[in-house]
Regions:
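One-carbon transfer enzymes
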Residues: 1-121
């Protein structure tokens, strides 16, 4: 689960080192400010390049379809890198060995949309 460019090297490393990546969750494509062009997230782009299935739900909260999909996936582990959504508590028990959250800064002190920039200021 991830969205920005920061998450791309982690997904590439997992893929290149032979780990089985069943699915990638990322934010849905967003309209850019100029021209209102629809832009995919960097993670969606690399998932397409590597031919890894991906999903782009607008929310996981009260989302039975995604809950059931993840449940049926029967994954061993989930890695979250700057996903940009709160993962509902009920999802946490769906993955056998749990979730690993990779964050660009110390949590909870430097959380939010710009943790690296805030830690520098």
């Amino acid at each position: 689960m991830g969205t920005p460019l920061f998450a791309v090297p982690i997904l590439k490393s997992l893929y290149q080192n032979g780990y089985s990546v069943s699915v990638v969750y990322t934010q849905p494509p967003q309209k850019s400010q100029r021209g209102q062009k629809i832009n995919k997230s960097p993670i969606q782009g690399i998932s397409e390049t590597l031919k890894i299935d991906y999903r782009t739900p607008s929310s996981l909260k009260n989302n039975k379809e995604e809950y059931n999909y993840l449940k049926e996936l029967d994954a061993d582990i989930a890695i979250v890198v700057a996903y940009g959504q709160i993962i509902p508590k009920e999802y946490l028990s769906l993955v056998k060995k749990g979730f690993i959250n990779i964050h660009a800064s110390l949590l909870p002190k430097w959380r939010g949309a710009a943790p690296i920039q805030r830690s520098i200021i």
